[in-house]
Amino acid sequence: MTTRDATELFSEWALRNRDEGMESGHAKSVNEMLNIAIPMLVEPFSAIDVGCGNGWVCRKLQSNDNCSKVVGIDGSIEMITKAKQKGGGQFHLAKLPGWTPSQKFDFIHSMEFLYYLKDPLEMLKIFFNEWLNDKGVLIAGVDHYLENVESHEWPKSLNVHMTTLSEEQWRQGMVDAGFTDVETRRVGIKSGFVGTLAIYGRKD
């Protein structure tokens, strides 16, 4: 059976309003990630959310008085349609890595996006070289990673490609891309869930 594009899956979920469940399900991890990253930023800051879904993180960032601009990008037409309806930023429909923003940003946030790419570590290099301003910060959260054994069945059960990397591979990928002050941390831990792997670093 041919593996389907992840954006098709997310469009189906948006039509069934599962984006709202994704928002509530990821909120704890994202809040912890923002609490890590925002104090690292030079203010005021511009931000882009990669894999923005219905734009809920963009709206959260826009409510921050120190956020001067926020942009969201997603490959799902239904998710972007919802994001534009709800407002709270500029939203673009595009698939990565074949799209580059017209400006660089101080903050790149991504939740549950990178492992859907065939080469997510190459995307980290693109973020570093083409998307991020000097002194900028990237933080990315992934629930599908080697140490989260329960996530190993997701590619088969959803019939979607996922790149499975270990915590150390993600950390080294950030270093190889050029980031400094690279750290990984488990966030959103709760009973029955080992946590979202948050990977973050700075462009000096």
Label each region the model flagged:
Residues D143-H161:
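Short, glycine-/aromatic-enriched active-site segment of Class I SAM-dependent methyltransferases
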Residues H109:
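A conserved beta-strand element that flanks and buttresses the S-adenosyl-L-methionine
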Residues L117-F127:
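A short, conserved alpha-helix within the catalytic core of class I
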Residues I48-G98:
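Class I SAM-dependent methyltransferase SAM/SAH-binding core
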Residues M1-M40, L146-E147:
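Conserved class I S-adenosyl-L-methionine
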Residues M162-G178:
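Short alpha-helix
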Residues R186-D204:
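Core SAM-dependent methyltransferase catalytic element
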Residues K135-D143:
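Conserved beta-strand signature within the Rossmann-like core of class I S-adenosyl-L-methionine
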